[in-house]
């Protein structure tokens, strides 16, 4: 059994896609369902999502947002109201045409996202500026009929959080859009240990129907980018289409200013590809379902299991801890919990008990140390923080070492062909250049970062005057 567990993971250097698939299966995060592209979230995978959800939910509620729930079905006529929006999602929509044996008078779309439902609701409940703002959030699943699927990264159905807010002024909606983006960025960095780049999407890459889309972008271990979260400012695009008006402070009718934003289980895919290694997952401690696992050595000997249980009682005051008292061998257990990425492993056997110590092993560095049992309650929280910082710094160094600055087309093509990572280059703002870089270099615009750099005066593609620096890259 242990041997099978060890040989199950393909090395990431040999086949990154297979390495990823091996991990999500062997670490028992997901299983495949009988419907193509739909995944079964197993207890370990769902516990990870619950921890992420709990943090995010608390942060949203602390900033005045309320949870609601909308239906999963959207009438076709409602979806058609915002032209750009429906065109953007049309290829991915799943339709319900029958109720039992009876054909429906109107097709129902299974929500790919819920803007239209929120808009219809807002149009009914808002009368005056006194009704604003409305700050709503929804936890749900959505369906997008993807052609190519991979667990967490791109699935037919996935879990997410989608926020929808309406405001009195353009300034308020813009502030909300950026505040949420900052919330997402701090969540990624402070809880998932994933460094992100904040910026704005180009017109080509923005959300269908949005006035502006902002994004956080992360770099995976194979050098590809992952759009980890987005925040959209709709302006009045949707409120005009759905007639969401209010009486302002002067008694005039105005359209509300609107935002939408979301993150999903795709973040779990990012977590795997940023921190994982050839032995399996490496869990960021703050969201790890189990932070400490205790493995009794020679547990059949008197006092060993009792001591492990006693230690668990102390540690559970400061961390999420479990004991594996199964009859599997210690070697099997070591491999199993390495695969699952549990941040800290404690080994305790008869000799350790004699010396009042345990063997502590870090998952991220494999470092072993002997530590007094009396120090565990104090040492473990500090070590979990240390592991988080180490993971973040390692990921940041990797990103920085795989970010390249170029000033001309040939240089950009050479880097894209020979390296993996982000490419920083100046851009004129023209769609034709963006499309040429996609076709001939194989990179898409990831974002126009808030932290701009002046690398050159000319566009990397056409040589005309550049307007901004853009991060480019291959992406999931």
Swiss-Prot record:
Keywords: Aminoacyl-tRNA synthetase, ATP-binding, Cytoplasm, Ligase, Nucleotide-binding, Protein biosynthesis. CDD domains: ProRS_anticodon_zinc (cd00862), ProRS_core_arch_euk (cd00778). GO terms for cellular component: aminoacyl-tRNA synthetase multienzyme complex; cytoplasm. GO terms for molecular function: ATP binding; catalytic activity, acting on a protein; proline-tRNA ligase activity; transferase activity. It is found in: Cytoplasm. It catalyses: tRNA(Pro) + L-proline + ATP = L-prolyl-tRNA(Pro) + AMP + diphosphate. Its EC number is 6.1.1.15. Its main location: cytoplasm. Pfam families: HGTP_anticodon (PF03129), ProRS-C_1 (PF09180), tRNA-synt_2b (PF00587). GO terms for biological process: prolyl-tRNA aminoacylation. Homodimer. Catalyzes the attachment of proline to tRNA(Pro) in a two-step reaction: proline is first activated by ATP to form Pro-AMP and then transferred to the acceptor end of tRNA(Pro). Belongs to the class-II aminoacyl-tRNA synthetase family. ProS type 3 subfamily. Consists of three domains: the N-terminal catalytic domain, the anticodon-binding domain and the C-terminal extension. PANTHER family: BIFUNCTIONAL GLUTAMATE_PROLINE--TRNA LIGASE, PROLYL-TRNA SYNTHETASE. This is Proline--tRNA ligase 2.
């Amino acid at each position: 059994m242990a041997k099978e567990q060890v040989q199950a993971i393909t090395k990431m250097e040999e086949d990154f896609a297979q390495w990823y698939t091996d991990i999500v299966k062997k670490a028992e995060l997901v299983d495949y369902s009988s419907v193509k592209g739909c995944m079964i979230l197993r207890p370990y995978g769902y516990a990870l999502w619950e921890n992420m959800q709990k943090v995010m939910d608390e942060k949203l509620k602390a900033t005045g947002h309320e949870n609601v729930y909308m239906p999963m079905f959207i009438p076709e006529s409602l979806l058609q109201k915002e032209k750009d929006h429906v065109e953007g999602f049309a290829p991915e929509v799943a339709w319900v045409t029958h109720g039992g044996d009876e054909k429906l008078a109107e097709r129902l779309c299974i929500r790919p996202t819920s803007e239209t439902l929120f808009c219809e609701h807002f149009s009914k409940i808002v009368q005056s500026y006194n009704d604003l703002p409305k700050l709503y959030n929804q936890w749900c699943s959505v369906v997008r009929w993807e052609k190519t699927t991979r667990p967490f990264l791109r699935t037919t159905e996935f879990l997410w959080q989608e926020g929808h807010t309406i405001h009195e002024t353009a300034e308020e909606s813009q502030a909300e859009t950026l505040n949420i983006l900052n919330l997402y960025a701090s969540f990624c960095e402070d809880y998932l240990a994933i460094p992100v780049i904040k910026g704005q999407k180009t017109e080509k890459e923005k959300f269908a129907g949005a006035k502006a889309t902002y994004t956080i972008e992360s770099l995976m271990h194979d050098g590809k980018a992952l759009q980890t979260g987005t925040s959209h400012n709709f302006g009045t695009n949707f409120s005009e289409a759905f007639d969401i008006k209010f009486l302002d402070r002067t008694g005039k009718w105005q359209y509300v200013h609107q935002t939408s934003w979301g993150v999903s289980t795709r973040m779990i895919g990012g977590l795997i590809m940023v921190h994982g290694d050839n032995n399996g997952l490496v869990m960021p401690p703050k969201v790890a379902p189990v932070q400490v696992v205790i493995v009794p050595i020679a547990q059949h000997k008197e006092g060993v299991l009792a001591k492990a249980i006693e230690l668990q009682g102390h540690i559970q005051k400061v961390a999420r801890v479990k004991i594996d008292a199964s009859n599997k061998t210690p070697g099997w257990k070591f491999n199993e919990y390495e695969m699952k990425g549990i941040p800290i492993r404690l080994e305790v056997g008869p000799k350790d008990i004699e010396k009042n110590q345990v063997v502590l092993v870090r998952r991220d560095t494999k470092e072993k140390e002997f530590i007094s049992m009396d120090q565990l309650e104090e040492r473990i929280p500090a070590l979990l923080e240390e592991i988080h910082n180490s993971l973040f710094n390692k990921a940041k160094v990797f990103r920085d070492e795989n970010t390249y600055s170029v000033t001309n087309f040939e240089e950009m093509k050479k880097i894209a062909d020979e390296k993996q990572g982000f490419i920083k280059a100046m851009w004129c703002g023209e769609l034709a250049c963006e499309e040429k870089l996609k076709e001939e270099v194989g990179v898409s615009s990831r974002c126009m970062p808030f932290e701009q750099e002046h690398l050159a005066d000319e566009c990397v593609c056409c040589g005309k005057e550049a307007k901004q620096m853009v991060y480019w890259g291959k992406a999931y």
